[in-house]
């Protein structure tokens, strides 16, 4: 994975997540394989996830498994300690440009997403995840705020 300047290159050659905004949605575009920068002037952006009314969505992460791409994003509000309501949702697609659909058949461009993790017990605002593969196992990494330690970030 390469990253920098708002661009993260993922598992599909020459495609990347770019120009994502907490309030305008997550977009992908083709990248120049040599420079890693978006291709085209302007680049052709594909919206892959958004929320109605500009509700917060950020922290995209895409992983490919078998014939599907899985798009993980964080919904709601981070960085408020024990008042954080951040959560992670996921959808999948056969194409990196979408559409990404959740388990209930909802399109992530329309606010869909299957809940992966949300706050519980003394865990507040889990989000901004990554998925790592080690041999044949996948690991889900994320941050959260620890309610047992007055909202310390972990």
What annotation goes with each model-predicted range?
Residues 1-154:
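Carbohydrate-active catalytic/glycan-binding domains of CAZyme proteins
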């Amino acid at each position: 994975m390469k990253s920098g300047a708002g661009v993260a290159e993922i598992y599909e050659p020459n495609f990347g997540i770019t120009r994502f905004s907490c309030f305008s949605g997550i977009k992908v575009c083709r990248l120049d394989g040599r420079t890693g920068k978006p291709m085209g002037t302007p680049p052709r952006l594909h919206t892959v996830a958004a929320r109605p009314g500009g509700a917060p969505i950020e922290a995209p992460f895409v992983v490919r498994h078998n014939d599907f791409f899985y798009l993980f994003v964080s919904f709601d509000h981070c960085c408020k300690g024990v008042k954080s309501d951040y959560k992670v949702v996921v959808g999948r697609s056969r194409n990196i440009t979408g559409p990404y659909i959740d388990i209930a058949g909802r399109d992530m461009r329309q606010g869909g997403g299957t809940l992966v993790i949300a706050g519980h017990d003394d865990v507040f605002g889990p989000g901004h995840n990554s998925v790592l593969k080690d041999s044949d196992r996948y690991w889900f990494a994320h941050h959260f705020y620890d309610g047992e330690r007055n909202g310390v970030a972990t």
